[in-house]
């Protein structure tokens, strides 16, 4: 039975990367998500149960507890909803230990580690033949870039990504579309498709 579920970790990490990109999340923020951290947005009912994501483990100032924020799903990233639905309803139940609340439980039942996510991203990046300068955080940078290009208000973007100062967000405003990051996105999609293929073979 264990071998028949070997595709699940690949599907999980690919979905994590898609979520990090679609909501502009830091590595620790996305890996720390629990099942209860999503809710409907009354102002955007078309997104169903994934209209709002509650980040409870945001980057903290030194000596302070983790910052919390709410991130709204925006139409440009609506595609992530089907990815999340598939993970939550179809795939996660196949692997989640009893009573686990983690959105992305590891094979041992605990939270997936930050190092595991970095290794997964590195593998995707290498498979795509991209520069080593790209890292997991590039997904978040790309989110900000797209939000700026799509004309969202600077303060809204700042609130979405949890930047303490507007100047931090403004660093991204001079960036142009990064083809390399988009290639990474395509590679992640291929990883998901490969994982789905695995479900059909078992």
Regions flagged by a language model, labelled:
Residues 61-85, 99-122:
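C-terminal catalytic core of Y-nucleophile DNA break-rejoin enzymes
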Residues 161-187:
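Catalytic-site neighborhood detector that most strongly recognizes the C-terminal catalytic loop/helix
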Residues 32-83:
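Conserved tyrosine-mediated DNA breakage-rejoining catalytic core shared by Y-recombinases
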Residues 3, 110, 118-159:
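Short, basic (Lys/Arg/His-rich) helix/loop patches that form interaction surfaces
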Residues 19-33, 150-152, 163:
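A short, glycine-centered helix-capping/turn motif at helix boundaries
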Residues 1-27:
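Basic, Lys/Arg- and aromatic-enriched nucleic-acid-binding interface segment
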Residues 187-202:
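C-terminal secondary-structure termini that scaffold catalytic or DNA-interacting sites
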Residues 9-14, 114, 118, 140-141:
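Short, leucine-enriched amphipathic alpha-helices that occur as contiguous helical runs
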């Amino acid at each position: 039975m264990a071998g028949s579920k070997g595709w699940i970790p690949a599907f999980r990490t690919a979905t994590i990367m898609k979520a990090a990109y679609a909501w502009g999340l830091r590595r620790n923020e996305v890996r720390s998500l629990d099942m209860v951290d999503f809710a409907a947005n009354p102002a955007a009912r078309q997104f169903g149960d994934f209209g709002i994501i509650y980040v409870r483990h945001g980057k903290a100032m030194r000596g302070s507890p983790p910052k919390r924020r709410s991130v709204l799903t925006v139409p440009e990233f609506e595609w992530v909803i089907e990815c999340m639905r598939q993970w939550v309803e179809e795939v996660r139940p196949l692997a989640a230990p009893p009573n686990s609340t983690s959105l992305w439980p590891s094979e041992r039942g605990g939270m997936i580690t930050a190092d595991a996510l970095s290794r997964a991203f590195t593998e995707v990046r290498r498979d795509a033949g991209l520069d080593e300068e790209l890292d997991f955080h590039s997904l978040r940078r790309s989110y900000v870039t797209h939000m700026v290009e799509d004309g969202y208000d600077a303060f809204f973007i700042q609130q979405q990504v949890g930047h303490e100062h507007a100047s931090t967000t403004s660093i991204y405003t001079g960036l142009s579309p990064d083809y390399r990051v988009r290639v990474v996105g395509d590679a992640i999609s291929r990883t998901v498709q490969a994982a789905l293929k695995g479900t059909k073979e078992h």
